[in-house]
Amino acid sequence: MAEQVVEILVSGGKATAGPPLGPAIGPLGVNIMQVVQKINEMTKDYDGMSVPVKVIVNTDKRTFEVEVGIPPASALVKKELGITTGSQEPKHQVAGNLTMEQVVKIAKMKQDAMLAYNLKNASKEVIGTCVSVGVNVEGMTPKEAQKAVDAGQFDSYFN
């Protein structure tokens, strides 16, 4: 059984037969439109976000299966704030402000894919992502927010 695995990043619910999907799947002998339909069906909840997708193709039987990953933390932060792009100058310009509840919500979504061993550390990873997106947390810069988490200021959210 010869299996080929194609890993791509697609816009949720908006995959097309064009690049990057078409050229990667086309030579493997499966119906590209069926693959696109399946991906769009499985990613429709992530509308507008970049979603990692793994397409596993059995080249002998010409069958496929699709596995959908969780979008990057930066995409989840932007969706939670309702913005399409982060700050162009993250240290000087603020693109938005997350509450600790929103940070914990994102951390719970991503926790299985993170190296963090508890919700508190997963939340700190999400706060770290806020640095590059240019988003503050509870009115503080991400670095200040991480120090506040370490100091126990938000411990009530992690129980």
Swiss-Prot record:
InterPro entries: Ribosomal_uL11, Ribosomal_uL11_C, Ribosomal_uL11_C_sf, Ribosomal_uL11_CS, Ribosomal_uL11_N, Ribosomal_uL11_N_sf. It comes from the Archaea. GO terms for molecular function: large ribosomal subunit rRNA binding; structural constituent of ribosome. Coiled coil: none annotated. Pfam families: Ribosomal_L11 (PF00298), Ribosomal_L11_N (PF03946). One of its GO terms (biological process) is translation. GO terms for cellular component: large ribosomal subunit. The keyword Ribosomal protein applies. SMART domains: RL11. Keywords: Ribonucleoprotein, Ribosomal protein, RNA-binding, rRNA-binding. Belongs to the universal ribosomal protein uL11 family. Forms part of the ribosomal stalk which helps the ribosome interact with GTP-bound translation factors. Part of the ribosomal stalk of the 50S ribosomal subunit. Interacts with L10 and the large rRNA to form the base of the stalk. L10 forms an elongated spine to which L12 dimers bind in a sequential fashion forming a multimeric L10(L12)X complex. This is Large ribosomal subunit protein uL11. It comes from Methanococcus maripaludis (strain C7 / ATCC BAA-1331).
